[in-house]
């Protein structure tokens, strides 16, 4: 052991055993991963922990994500009622369980706690926290673009000579966040003495760059070990303690309050992307916020919406903004705009469904949601039928003005993916474990299927089904591909020879189904066979994958999108990868084909839109 390491270890041991230093500190309680649902054990133990905290002396209490299990309005209201009893200033960040499975499309948690980020000052300390994602679909954590801008501008404002910064996020400053390097690069420019996260329900000391970080406990650490974290910040040290309810604090980590860091250089966002041979690649748009939607098209424009509730029409040829409007509730939008008839565009959003004029964005109609948000991708069929999934319902609306024609409202959770339609069959999944087929004519139920599992998160809630003449084929997070008789709804076969999830598509002639697996493979399956018949598998070299991005075939090329900004093109005839193209670091929202030009368009969560054209 070097002398430097020995000295550092001795100083750490001394810091952890000097109670006098801790008593002089700014002191915070951190609750992380409390996972409260009404009446569960965590509900009871959180109440006990809050009562214990109220007997102490703290400067603030920070709740660092995963307040609930499913982010429902009921669960958020319940945990808020418990947290309101805390007598100290309270600051709350959502976690992936509030962002990913949300009854309100993340709106309720923001409204309840006044936002999804915070900053406050305590003497010479600036404490700052931002949201982690992932947002309303399976994905890696992601810091929204507007939150990165806010973080820098906020630290510019608050950090004056003599100030130190303590950072909070539910996710670690590691590869769990697709854009953690951009996040870290900002923090490294300021006197950040530490970063504190949860998520893994475990203790861990680690470095991000040269910033010291701590992964801290959950409310429930098993074996009846319920508790929270105490953080003390003194002029020279930050101390982190494990506090089991009813027991004395136990020292875990101590950080030397280092305030100068090595700058982290990032690649320029203007980096030129080299197009694969035989293709052109153009960046159509770069947004100042994050984009969670797929894309809609008409003759001139591409349409999408962002995390600030801005809906935009951009000329797809020259990349110029045609118009931009805010949805009425200004909440993040997760559904793609749907181009309708007579210069009309439907914009599903958290609180309703807006119909706007495609030429200027002028609001024509605004239909308020009966219950819950619209997060599903709607569809306009070639025959002119507009179908839109919602919360606990799916609707057919008039394509001229969005007026409701019928609704099927016997769902138990929200729709998310676009439905599949052929003839009178409308097939769609919902996050209630079920796949349903209803009549296009009147919305009456024809059949319902589920995989027999009770967990909503294992059902076909975010997959676009494939319809053949006699089958419905799906994949789901239970890691099966399933074929169902299209007429009766009876299960024909199931296969788990690959780790399927939610990414599915089909060949142009409907004879093959393509699935992207969790191992980064593209699997081709015979859609005409009465039994499961694998045709071929290509390793796309993506490694671990979970992005629900659909697979699409155009002009003899199969396109798949990844969780880390890569679009891969596969030649189905040669059964080989043509090319893989990195367009960014974040998830590809979808592979969308422009019906006018046949070009492939993709949007990335980081806010960019690209066009890929075959020459």
Predicted feature residues:
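N-terminal active-site segment of His-dependent metallophosphoesterases
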Residues: 22-78
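Metal-dependent catalytic neighborhoods of phosphoester/phosphodiester hydrolases
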Residues: 41, 65-84, 99-111, 176-182, ...
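Short coil/turn segments that connect the beta-strands within blades of beta-propeller domains
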Residues: 299-300, 342-343, 382-384, 423-425, ...
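His/acidic metal-ligating clusters that form di-metal
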Residues: 53-60, 139-212
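Short loop/turn segments that connect beta-strands within beta-propeller blades
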Residues: 315-319, 357-361, 398-402, 439-443, ...
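Extracytoplasmic beta-rich repeat domains
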Residues: 275-296, 324-339, 366-380, 406-422, ...
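Binuclear metal-dependent phosphoesterase catalytic core
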Residues: 204, 209-273
């Amino acid at each position: 052991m070097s002398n430097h390491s020995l000295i550092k270890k001795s100083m750490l041991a001394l810091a952890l055993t000097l109670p006098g230093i801790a008593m002089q500190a700014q002191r915070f309680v951190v609750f992380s991963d409390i996972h409260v649902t009404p009446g569960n054990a965590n509900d009871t133990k959180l109440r006990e922990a809050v009562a214990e905290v109220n007997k102490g002396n703290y400067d603030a209490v920070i709740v660092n994500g995963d307040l609930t299990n499913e982010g429902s309005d009921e669960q958020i209201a319940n945990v808020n009622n418990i947290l309101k009893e805390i007598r100290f200033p309270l600051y709350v960040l959502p976690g992936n369980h509030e962002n990913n499975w949300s009854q309100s499309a993340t709106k309720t948690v923001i409204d309840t706690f006044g936002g999804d980020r915070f900053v406050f000052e305590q003497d010479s300390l600036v404490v700052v926290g931002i949201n982690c994602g992932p947002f309303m679909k399976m994905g890696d954590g992601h810091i929204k673009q507007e939150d990165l801008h806010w973080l820098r501008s906020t630290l510019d404002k608050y950090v004056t000579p003599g100030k130190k910064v303590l950072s909070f996020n539910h996710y670690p400053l590691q590869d769990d966040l697709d854009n953690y390097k951009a996040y870290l690069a900002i923090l490294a420019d300021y006197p950040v003495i530490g970063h504190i996260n949860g998520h893994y329900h475990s203790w861990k000391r680690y470095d991000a760059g040269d910033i010291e970080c701590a992964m801290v406990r959950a409310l429930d650490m098993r074996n009846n070990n319920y508790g929270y974290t105490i953080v003390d910040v003194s002029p020279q040290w930050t101390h982190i303690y494990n506090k089991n309810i009813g027991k004395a604090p136990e020292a875990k980590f101590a950080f030397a309050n280092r305030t100068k860091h090595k700058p982290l250089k990032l690649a320029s966002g203007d980096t030129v992307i080299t197009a694969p041979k035989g293709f052109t690649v153009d960046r159509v748009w770069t947004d100042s916020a994050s984009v969670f939607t797929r894309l809609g098209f008409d003759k001139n424009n591409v349409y999408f919406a962002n995390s600030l509730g801005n809906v935009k029409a951009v000329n797809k040829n020259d990349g110029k903004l045609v118009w931009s409007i805010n949805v009425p509730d200004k909440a993040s939008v997760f559904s793609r705009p749907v181009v309708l008839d007579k210069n009309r565009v439907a914009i599903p959003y958290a609180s309703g469904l807006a119909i706007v004029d495609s030429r200027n964005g002028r609001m024509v109609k605004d239909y308020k949601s009966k219950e819950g948000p619209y997060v599903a991708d709607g569809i306009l069929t070639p025959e002119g039928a507009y179908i839109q999934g919602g919360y606990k319902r799916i609707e057919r609306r008039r394509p001229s003005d969005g007026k409701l024609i019928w609704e099927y409202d016997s769902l138990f959770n929200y729709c998310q993916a676009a439905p599949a339609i052929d003839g009178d069959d409308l097939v769609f999944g919902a996050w209630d474990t079920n796949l349903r087929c209803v009549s296009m004519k009147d919305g009456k139920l024809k059949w319902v299927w589920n995989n027999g599992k009770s967990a909503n998160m294992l059902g076909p809630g975010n997959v676009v089904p494939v319809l053949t003449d006699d089958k419905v084929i799906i994949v789901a997070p239970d890691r099966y591909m399933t074929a169902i008789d299209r007429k009766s709804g009876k299960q024909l076969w199931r296969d788990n020879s690959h780790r399927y999830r939610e990414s599915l598509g089909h060949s142009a002639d409907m004879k093959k189904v393509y699935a992207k697996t969790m191992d980064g493979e593209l699997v081709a399956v015979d859609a005409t066979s009465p039994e499961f018949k694998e045709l071929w598998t290509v390793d796309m070299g993506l490694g671990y994958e979970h992005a629900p991005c659909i697979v699409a075939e155009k002009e003899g090329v199969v396109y798949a999108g990844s969780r880390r900004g890569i679009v891969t093109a596969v030649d189905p005839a040669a059964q080989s990868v043509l090319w893989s193209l990195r367009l960014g670091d974040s998830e590809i929202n979808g592979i969308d084909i422009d019906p006018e030009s046949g070009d492939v368009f993709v949007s990335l969560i980081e806010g960019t839109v690209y066009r890929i054209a075959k020459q």
